[in-house]
């Protein structure tokens, strides 16, 4: 892929690339919709991701091109035109990174050319947007020799999502893409950003990624609505509790005080955030103890909560996860990512992978009318120069 990208770069921009980098995508093993509630998450970076090449220019023009969106052509603007532009589509993500990096580093005083190509399926909820954000930051870091720490770039990526793109997401995606480590997941406390690397070894089992192949736009989904509902629950609980996030409560504490929340729907949203936080801590222990059966049961319980209490699954994700849960050799399955579409994951015996794919595909085609896709990918390092 890189050899072809170098040729494409020269034909597009008439110069050779100076630097190149890779940023992975991610799966979240468990801990869904907990990152903006001050809870724990348990993600891993994956070998699917985004590759990028870049070269400096002598003027102030920035030119961006994606092999994944060839119809868009070269997106061009200057260092003085760093505002969101709907017509610039995917290029708003790198543009946002440039905007906030430029505010922190005076060294960014020249334009540059960037070519990107990703192999994360579009709309799969495997964090292609955070991948391109951190990739852009790492390319610019190399081009201008910036003293840019990983955590600094991670936080900047979240600012791009929140302020530039208008999605009130938490920090999980950027964190795992910035800090990922091959063959390890990260248990991250999103309240403090304390984290542990945890070997992601499942013995005779593997994680299978199952894609609904239904497109979802995060900004237009109910993501922001769910966050607002959780903030509503928190403010009602704060009438009697000195807490700053739902992640500070145990399930037992929540059950004691849940009557403070007047709206039944809002109460269920909070119940998910708090119960999912407990499941994530239990899953960490289960994996450390090689208790894969319990890990699988926690995946199933997570999906049930996301379906019934948080209501972010939908018929496509439910069909994938619930069919997979019934397949012999599968210990557990759940949706991963923001929900509404995208992917589910299953913990499946290596000898049952084909059985899983056959049975889930048949059920999915029967109910939804088109086929899902399946991926088996290794766990990767975080963003890096190549």
Curated annotation (Swiss-Prot):
- Residue(s) at site: Transition state stabilizer: 26
Record InterPro entries: Galactokinase (IPR000705), Galactokinase_bac (IPR022963), Galactokinase_CS (IPR019741), GalKase_N (IPR019539), GHMP_kinase_C_dom (IPR013750), GHMP_kinase_C_sf (IPR036554), GHMP_kinase_N_dom (IPR006204), Mevalonate/galactokinase (IPR006206)
Where does it mainly reside?
Answer: cytoplasm
Task: Name the positions where substrate binds.
Answer: 32-35, 223
Q: Which residues bind Mg(2+)?
A: 129, 161
What positions constitute the catalytic site? Answer: 173 (proton acceptor)
Q: Name one Pfam family in it.
A: GHMP_kinases_N
For this record, the Gene Ontology CC terms, alphabetical, are:
cytosol
Q: Which residues bind ATP?
A: 66, 123-129
Q: Does the keyword Zinc apply?
A: no
User: Is Transcription there in the keyword field?
Assistant: no
Q: Which GO terms describe its molecular function?
A: ATP binding; galactokinase activity; magnesium ion binding
User: According to its UniProt record, where is this protein located?
Assistant: Cytoplasm
Tell me which NCBIfam families the record gives: gal_kin (TIGR00131), PRK05322.1 (NF003705)
Q: What does this protein do?
A: Catalyzes the transfer of the gamma-phosphate of ATP to D-galactose to form alpha-D-galactose-1-phosphate (Gal-1-P).
Give the protein name, as stated in the record: Galactokinase
What gene is it encoded by? galK
